[in-house]
Amino acid sequence: MVDHARAARLAKRIQTIVATAIEREVKDRRLEYVTVTDTRVTGDLHDATVYYTVRGRTIDDQPDLKAAAEALQRARGQLRKIVGDQLSVRFTPTLSFELDTVPETSAHMEDLLARARARDLELAELKKNAQPAGDAHPYKDDDAMND
């Protein structure tokens, strides 16, 4: 029987442990700009997927995603050992790392919404000065009203 609450608690704890270990214990400069964003644990508690983002050295720099992925793969065993030492579970989950695409997806959605808002404002401006084509009341019959 799967205990989802326990899996969620374990995932949160693994996320904290891995983030702290990357910051303080793993000595790899390629992980300086890595941020752990989320962790998911399978129902049997044997596998954990750690989601991460990478930022550049400055705002204008592109992040080195490949180097960060290689560094995480290289440090995977060390991180699993650290997780195992700090968790009180019978089996230490295997760790896998995946780049978190949520920030890029949300930025794309924000861009689409901004374009839609701009188009709505443009149409509202055009509508202010617009005149109806034809009569103001095209379905009214003036002759029928005079009878």
From Swiss-Prot:
Residues 137-147 have a biased composition (Basic and acidic residues). Residues 126-147 are annotated as: Disordered. One of its GO terms (cellular component) is cytosol. Belongs to the RbfA family. GO terms for biological process: maturation of SSU-rRNA. Gene3D superfamilies: 3.30.300.20. It holds the Pfam family RBFA. The keyword Cytoplasm applies. This is Ribosome-binding factor A. One of several proteins that assist in the late maturation steps of the functional core of the 30S ribosomal subunit. Associates with free 30S ribosomal subunits (but not with 30S subunits that are part of 70S ribosomes or polysomes). Required for efficient processing of 16S rRNA. May interact with the 5'-terminal helix region of 16S rRNA.
